[in-house]
Amino acid sequence: MMPYERLRNAVKKTIGTKQTTKAVQKHTAAIVYVAKDAEPHVINPLVKLCKEKGIEVITVDSMLELGKACGIEVGSASAAIVAE
């Protein structure tokens, strides 16, 4: 459960693949989280981009748990902690 703790406590974060991809492109994402049960065509381009930019990717078990860790009631395929 440790990976969620950092995300929960993060002051700034992105929720969802569109916002998270933008943060990676702008070099503001510190750590990216992707859900194992998300559609591969949704998260694979994001994971590839993170590798290119040298950003750590943490894979978590479920979209629902990732969403909850972000404080939303629905699932999220990805999220990121944004550097201050």
What are the roles of these predicted feature ranges?
Residues 31, 40-58, 65:
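Amphipathic, hydrophobic secondary-structure cores in small proteins
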Residues 21-22, 46, 70:
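Short, flexible, solvent-exposed loop/turn segments with mixed acidic/basic and small polar residues
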Residues 1-30, 39:
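Ribosome large-subunit tunnel/peptidyl-transferase-proximal elements
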Residues 9, 35, 55:
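Glycine- and other small-residue-rich loops at beta-strand/loop junctions that grip anionic moieties
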Residues 55-84:
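C-terminal structural segments of small proteins and small subunits
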